[in-house]
């Protein structure tokens, strides 16, 4: 198993220079705060130059300081409670900068997802959706919103789509009782990963269904369970996980599925428009 950054620091500590040891010691004791610091700020609190901090990150094998910072934030996301996350973020973020900080984080998540997405995996995911006899979608906690959004549109485009709802633990498995070969389960989960989603994916896999995961990276437990797993960035600000990039990926799923059979898509929405008009589903703007 790949070591996390804290394990790497402990392992390499004896070989560090004096300045590197100072940085490493601070991070090991205060990783929750270091995860939100700029290179300049980390250099300031450790008494070394910003360039020393940047070189330190590169020596550890990261693509500059942003790469090391992301690795630290992964630790924070997986180890800290929501309250601890708030405290860590507030200790390094000026309240007046919240709006820009959140918007920048979302922009960065989208850009990182765009830079790292594997187009072949995405195409495989779309093929899995289109070839499935029955599609089950599961996402717990904040991922419920993503699962529901995906289901709304897939139900318009495809025939057999079910959202697995979190009511009680046993009822999750009851909703998956008929799943089997030829079916697909789409699992959506981000740190702190839902045990129920992971368990439901394993349940479906054991019954012969194919598994498609949407998560944040290779360290996610969904990665080992899924036949195809797509990664989107969801770097957090305080107790929040950003759902912007995951939602954008879901939008891409929906658009790709609809594009594979444009005739059916047009017919479906033409019929829906007539229904919406007849039953006054939407209001009209009077000029």
Features from the language model and the residues they span:
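Glycine-rich phosphate/diphosphate-binding loops that line cofactor/substrate pockets in enzymes
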Residues: 120-132
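Short, Lys/Arg-enriched, disordered terminal segments
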Residues: 1-12, 284-287
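Glycine-rich phosphate-binding loops that contact phosphosugars or nucleotide phosphates
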Residues: 130-248, 252-261
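A short, charged, Gly/Pro-tolerant segment at domain boundaries
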Residues: 263-287
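HTH-adjacent hinge/linker in prokaryotic transcriptional regulators
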Residues: 2-6, 15, 22, 32-36, ...
């Amino acid at each position: 198993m790949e070591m996390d950054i804290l394990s790497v620091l402990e392992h390499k500590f004896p070989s560090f220079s004096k300045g590197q040891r100072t940085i490493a010691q601070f991070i090991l004791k205060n990783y929750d705060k270091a995860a939100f610091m700029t290179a300049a700020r980390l250099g300031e609190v450790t008494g070394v130059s910003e360039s020393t901090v940047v070189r330190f990150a590169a020596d550890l094998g990261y693509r500059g300081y942003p790469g090391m910072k992301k690795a630290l934030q992964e630790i924070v996301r997986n180890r800290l409670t929501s309250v601890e996350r708030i405290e860590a973020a507030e200790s390094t973020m000026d309240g007046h900068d919240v709006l820009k900080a959140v918007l920048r984080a979302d922009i960065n998540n989208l850009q990182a997802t765009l830079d790292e997405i594997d187009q072949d995996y995405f195409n495989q995911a779309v093929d899995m959706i289109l070839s499935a006899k029955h599609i089950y979608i599961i996402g717990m906690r904040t991922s419920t919103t993503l699962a529901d959004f995906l289901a709304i549109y897939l139900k318009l485009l495809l025939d057999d789509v079910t959202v697995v709802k979190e009511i009680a633990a046993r009822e999750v498995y009851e909703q998956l009782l008929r799943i089997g070969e030829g079916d697909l389960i789409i699992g959506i989960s981000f740190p702190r990963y839902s045990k129920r989603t992971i368990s439901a994916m394993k349940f479906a896999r054991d019954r012969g269904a194919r598994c498609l995961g949407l998560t944040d990276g290779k360290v996610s437990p969904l990665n080992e369970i899924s036949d195809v797993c797509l990664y989107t960035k969801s770097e957090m600000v305080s107790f929040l996980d950003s759902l912007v990039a995951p939602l954008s990926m879901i939008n891409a799923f929906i658009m790709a599925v609809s594009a594979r059979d444009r005739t059916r898509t047009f017919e479906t929405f033409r019929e829906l428009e007539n229904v919406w008009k007849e039953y006054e589903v939407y209001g009209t703007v009077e000029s």
